[in-house]
């Protein structure tokens, strides 16, 4: 079974511990951050393509591209994130500034 049910760790643990069902719990965080990045870039999510990698609840956006032109949008996103309201994802923005990459899915998950 593939499950996107939250909370992911508790649901996956319960199913695998108390049943014979083989299950993998997945977080839809990559889709959440895709919408956040698109919003920061004043675009719709279908106008950007992102590549992410990492472990559940601690991934990194490695690439952001314009789906029409193929242009690298990471420099534009870094600039937009630097100008964003201070209350928007402060931990994620600090990690972006420190590492050059934006973590996902959100501050509360990354802080786990």
Regions found by a protein language model. Name each.
Residues 1-64:
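Internal, well-ordered domain-core segments that constitute the primary functional module
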Residues 40-112:
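Long, compositionally biased stretches enriched for glycine and/or charged residues
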